């Protein structure tokens, strides 16, 4: 699209729909200026944390100025709808929860990088724009913004060889995925003469050019790399291990959520010509990811790598139900993406607190007898572990039950069986963690310390894990409306 045409047709009134994004951008700019003018001090550290929290809160409040449930703005390059708004609110809340842990983590390491605050804001901005567009250029730029921010944050502690290695792997493979996405976008535009994914999908039929097929495959491949689908996952365990644990939690929760949104938006536009290819390819990738992800997690001794492979397996769970290409499948996928961001972030934040001890090395053996030293952390970690496993009455159980139901409705029973088998495999390492924490008689020589904000964040995540598990319709009703609305809009086009 010609940029002059875009600017000429844009009503300045439409900028009100970007207030949350604009607020985050202003927050990043203010933090950047403060980093330049303020000298290093304890006061500066506290100011950065609280100003970050303030701007995130203002961004949340700015959603109240929006009065549209569906609207294409800026000549159709940006879409305002309930899925985008819900996703962005979730991403902001997850960022709010991560910041206190990141602040404490850097303090404890005696290496305080102020730039990590505005880089986090820029990554959040990329996630927000990624969550609200069907336009190939906006999606590509958003992917770049999130990815570059993650590369930098992964290599935050450059003195560590592991940090360097993980960051380099992430940079190289992430860069390849961006190039693949760009090639895919170029092929799709060349074949369809449109930058809108909705129009591109509708333009496909059985007589279409092979270039459109190649473009779609390349574009989906780029997202498969980003969310860690096997066999495109090689960067993820190393990057998650290399990054500071609060950043790992941020990437595994808000990052995964943002990367999945474009795939979720795609489902209602898979037409009859694409359905068979979509179901076969997506279901095979999902089955491999579920089984191999859990099998690799089973042999890990490092807790961060274990949770990294668990994250890969959960991407497989979400992908499996997307293969059904149904309204129920989309509802289950949206629900599972959101609930994983809660329980996944909670597990990584508990590890972040444990890492504050100099004696902690993230080894599975070190968690033995943890309940003796810190009951709150042990119980919280157990709650998140049971949720990841899918034990009632947690949100993880509801999520997996909905995924299985979504597969059963479309008679994809074999993939449902794979889901059950993968969950059975995961029992081996999840239960081992809980047994070590509560039943192993080992004397722990360290006691984790955490402040009130960290306590509140973990407590809130534990509450949500139980509350949304026991009252699933609180979240489910809203997500059902989102899914039905997306299919309704697709059918009207």
From Swiss-Prot:
<dbReference type="GO" id="GO:0048038">
    <property type="term" value="F:quinone binding"/>
</dbReference>
<keyword id="KW-0874">Quinone</keyword>
<dbReference type="InterPro" id="IPR001750">
    <property type="entry name" value="ND/Mrp_TM"/>
</dbReference>
<keyword id="KW-1133">Transmembrane helix</keyword>
<dbReference type="GO" id="GO:0050136">
    <property type="term" value="F:NADH:ubiquinone reductase (non-electrogenic) activity"/>
</dbReference>
<feature type="transmembrane region" description="Helical">
    <location>
        <begin position="171"/>
        <end position="191"/>
    </location>
</feature>
<feature type="transmembrane region" description="Helical">
    <location>
        <begin position="82"/>
        <end position="102"/>
    </location>
</feature>
<comment type="subunit">
    <text>NDH-1 is composed of 14 different subunits. Subunits NuoA, H, J, K, L, M, N constitute the membrane sector of the complex.</text>
</comment>
<dbReference type="Pfam" id="PF00361">
    <property type="entry name" value="Proton_antipo_M"/>
</dbReference>
<feature type="transmembrane region" description="Helical">
    <location>
        <begin position="137"/>
        <end position="157"/>
    </location>
</feature>
<keyword id="KW-0472">Membrane</keyword>
<dbReference type="GO" id="GO:0008137">
    <property type="term" value="F:NADH dehydrogenase (ubiquinone) activity"/>
</dbReference>
<dbReference type="GO" id="GO:0042773">
    <property type="term" value="P:ATP synthesis coupled electron transport"/>
</dbReference>
<keyword id="KW-1003">Cell membrane</keyword>
<keyword id="KW-0830">Ubiquinone</keyword>
<dbReference type="InterPro" id="IPR010096">
    <property type="entry name" value="NADH-Q_OxRdtase_suN/2"/>
</dbReference>
<feature type="transmembrane region" description="Helical">
    <location>
        <begin position="456"/>
        <end position="476"/>
    </location>
</feature>
<feature type="transmembrane region" description="Helical">
    <location>
        <begin position="334"/>
        <end position="354"/>
    </location>
</feature>
<keyword id="KW-0812">Transmembrane</keyword>
<comment type="similarity">
    <text>Belongs to the complex I subunit 2 family.</text>
</comment>
<keyword id="KW-0813">Transport</keyword>
<feature type="transmembrane region" description="Helical">
    <location>
        <begin position="412"/>
        <end position="434"/>
    </location>
</feature>
<feature type="transmembrane region" description="Helical">
    <location>
        <begin position="47"/>
        <end position="67"/>
    </location>
</feature>
<feature type="transmembrane region" description="Helical">
    <location>
        <begin position="111"/>
        <end position="131"/>
    </location>
</feature>
<feature type="transmembrane region" description="Helical">
    <location>
        <begin position="244"/>
        <end position="264"/>
    </location>
</feature>
<keyword id="KW-0997">Cell inner membrane</keyword>
<comment type="function">
    <text>NDH-1 shuttles electrons from NADH, via FMN and iron-sulfur (Fe-S) centers, to quinones in the respiratory chain. The immediate electron acceptor for the enzyme in this species is believed to be ubiquinone. Couples the redox reaction to proton translocation (for every two electrons transferred, four hydrogen ions are translocated across the cytoplasmic membrane), and thus conserves the redox energy in a proton gradient.</text>
</comment>
<feature type="transmembrane region" description="Helical">
    <location>
        <begin position="210"/>
        <end position="230"/>
    </location>
</feature>
<feature type="transmembrane region" description="Helical">
    <location>
        <begin position="379"/>
        <end position="399"/>
    </location>
</feature>
<keyword id="KW-1278">Translocase</keyword>
<feature type="transmembrane region" description="Helical">
    <location>
        <begin position="279"/>
        <end position="299"/>
    </location>
</feature>
<dbReference type="GO" id="GO:0005886">
    <property type="term" value="C:plasma membrane"/>
</dbReference>
<protein>
    <recommendedName>
        <fullName>NADH-quinone oxidoreductase subunit N 1</fullName>
        <ecNumber>7.1.1.-</ecNumber>
    </recommendedName>
</protein>
<feature type="transmembrane region" description="Helical">
    <location>
        <begin position="18"/>
        <end position="38"/>
    </location>
</feature>
<keyword id="KW-0520">NAD</keyword>
């Amino acid at each position: 699209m010609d940029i002059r045409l875009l600017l000429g047709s844009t009503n300045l009134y439409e900028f009100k729909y970007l207030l949350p994004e604009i607020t985050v951008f202003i927050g990043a700019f203010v933090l950047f200026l403060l980093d330049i003018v303020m000298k290093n001090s304890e006061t500066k550290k506290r100011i950065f944390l609280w100003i970050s929290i303030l701007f995130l809160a203002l961004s949340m409040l700015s959603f109240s100025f929006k009065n549209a449930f569906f609207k294409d703005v800026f000549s159709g390059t940006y879409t305002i709808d309930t899925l985008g708004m819900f996703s962005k609110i979730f991403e902001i809340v997850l960022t709010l929860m991560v910041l206190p842990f990141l602040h404490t983590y850097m303090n404890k390491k005696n290496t305080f990088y102020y730039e990590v605050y505005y880089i986090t804001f820029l990554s959040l901005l990329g996630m927000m724009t990624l969550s609200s567009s069907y336009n190939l250029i906006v999606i590509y730029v958003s992917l770049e913004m999130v990815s570059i921010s993650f590369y930098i944050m992964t290599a935050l502690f450059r003195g560590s060889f592991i940090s360097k290695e993980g960051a380099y792997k992430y940079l190289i493979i992430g860069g390849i995925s961006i190039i693949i996405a760009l090639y895919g976008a170029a092929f799709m535009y060349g074949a369809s003469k449109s930058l809108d994914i909705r129009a591109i999908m509708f333009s496909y039929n059985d007589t279409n050019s092979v270039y459109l097929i190649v473009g779609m495959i390349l574009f989906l491949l780029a997202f498969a790399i980003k969310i860690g689908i096997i066999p495109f996952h090689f960067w993820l365990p190393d990057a998650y291990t290399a990054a500071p644990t609060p950043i790992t939690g941020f990437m595994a929760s808000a990052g995964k959520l943002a990367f999945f949104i474009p795939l979720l938006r795609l489902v209602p536009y898979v037409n009859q010509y694409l359905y068979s290819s979509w179901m076969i390819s997506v279901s095979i990738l999902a089955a491999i990811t579920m089984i191999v992800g859990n099998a690799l997690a089973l042999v890990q001794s490092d807790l961060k790598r274990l949770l990294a492979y668990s994250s890969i397996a959960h991407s497989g769970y979400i992908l499996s139900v997307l293969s059904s290409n149904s309204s129920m499948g989309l509802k289950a996928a949206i629900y599972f993406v959101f609930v994983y961001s809660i329980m996944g972030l909670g597990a990584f934040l508990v590890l972040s607190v444990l890492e504050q001890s100099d004696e902690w090395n993230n080894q599975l053996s070190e968690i033995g007898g943890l309940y003796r030293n810190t009951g709150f952390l042990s119980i919280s970690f157990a709650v998140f572990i049971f949720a990841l496993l899918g034990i009632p009455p947690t949100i993880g159980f509801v999520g997996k039950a909905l995924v299985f139901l979504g597969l059963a409705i479309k008679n994809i029973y074999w993939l449902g069986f794979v889901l059950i088998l993968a969950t059975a495999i995961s029992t081996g390492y999840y239960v081992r963690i809980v047994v070590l924490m509560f039943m192993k008689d080992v004397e722990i020589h360290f006691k984790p310390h955490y402040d009130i904000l960290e306590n509140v964040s973990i407590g809130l995540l534990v509450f949500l894990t139980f509350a949304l598990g026991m009252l699933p319709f609180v979240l489910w009703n809203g997500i059902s409306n989102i899914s039905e609305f997306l299919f309704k809009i697709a059918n009207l086009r």
